Amino acid sequence: MKYFFIIALLLSSLYSQTIKDISNIIGIRENQLIGYGLIVGLAGTGDKSKFTMQSLQNLLRNSYIKIPAGSINSKNIAAVMVTADLPPFARQGDKIKVNISTIGDAKSVDHGELLITQLKGVDGNVYALAQGTIVANENNKTTGFIYDGATVENEINFDLQSEDSIQLSLLKNSAKNADLIETKINDTFGKKLATALDTRTIDVKKPDGMSIVKFISLVQNIELESSFKKKLIIDMNRESILAGGDIVIDPVTIARDTFTIRINKTGLGEVDWNNPTINTGVDIGDDVRIADKPVIDINNAMINTKNPPTVADLVRSMKVMKLPMKEIIDTLKMIKDMGAIDVDIELRE
């Protein structure tokens, strides 16, 4: 975990804004799927709701197993909602991740087995079947996931090859950004291909003789100036920064329930802790050390940095001090709200 976190921080410094980062192609998007399922094999952490027992009875009845009403009373099963995102151009046999959330009073879904569950779109059609062993989320055991837990059974048809143009939709309404993207695309191709239709939509015509796939790839990977707001992407399951770790934090003071963080241009100032359980005087590595008293100071005891403090510096410091990920996220949101970082925060599970 420690090494993955360090690698993720290094990769985040290579992250730059492209057209793909701040726009979607109209018509090419994920579709949300949902289904009702049952989990079995829980070690006494399931629920005892009547509708869960009824669902199990119906399932067994469909398998020609007759169970008298009221004879099932087990905390080893749970009723759940199963959701998934069907990627654009997903094909039959593809595997996709599914997310699990309990409906009743189950305490945990960890290591439970999701029985085969139909996942439907808003049109009522079944697009995938989910099944497998669940891994509970660290911060909330009543939710979980199954990587590659669903198999795509039906495809959503979209004839991309027949298109001679695409329309970009900005994630956020901005006349400045729409105009800039129009200019960048036209400059890149050396001809008038892009036209901003409004402050959020840009129509882009495909050059003659170029495949639509190559065209989309070229357009989406055009790099944009730093005037675009950066994105901070955090993987909640791995508790790591995927992108945006190099974002500099402006001077700010954040007061939380158990600590206060002061950040200045030269580094993280002292952090006042009221938590007596923090371990002190422990060497963590060559460039990271917890001081003789529970404080954080990049210039001295904690993390040495020649540059102004970044999001990665702050997150690393808070992780070393054993703060939970929720506390770190809340702190970053407070820093954003106070204007010390101009960034969109995206949490991924």
From Swiss-Prot:
<comment type="function">
    <text>Assembles around the rod to form the L-ring and probably protects the motor/basal body from shearing forces during rotation.</text>
</comment>
<comment type="subunit">
    <text>The basal body constitutes a major portion of the flagellar organelle and consists of four rings (L,P,S, and M) mounted on a central rod.</text>
</comment>
<dbReference type="GO" id="GO:0009428">
    <property type="term" value="C:bacterial-type flagellum basal body, distal rod, P ring"/>
</dbReference>
<dbReference type="GO" id="GO:0005198">
    <property type="term" value="F:structural molecule activity"/>
</dbReference>
<keyword id="KW-0732">Signal</keyword>
<keyword id="KW-0574">Periplasm</keyword>
<protein>
    <recommendedName>
        <fullName>Flagellar P-ring protein</fullName>
    </recommendedName>
</protein>
<dbReference type="Pfam" id="PF02119">
    <property type="entry name" value="FlgI"/>
</dbReference>
<feature type="signal peptide">
    <location>
        <begin position="1"/>
        <end position="16"/>
    </location>
</feature>
<dbReference type="GO" id="GO:0071973">
    <property type="term" value="P:bacterial-type flagellum-dependent cell motility"/>
</dbReference>
<comment type="similarity">
    <text>Belongs to the FlgI family.</text>
</comment>
<keyword id="KW-0975">Bacterial flagellum</keyword>
<dbReference type="InterPro" id="IPR001782">
    <property type="entry name" value="Flag_FlgI"/>
</dbReference>
<dbReference type="GO" id="GO:0030288">
    <property type="term" value="C:outer membrane-bounded periplasmic space"/>
</dbReference>
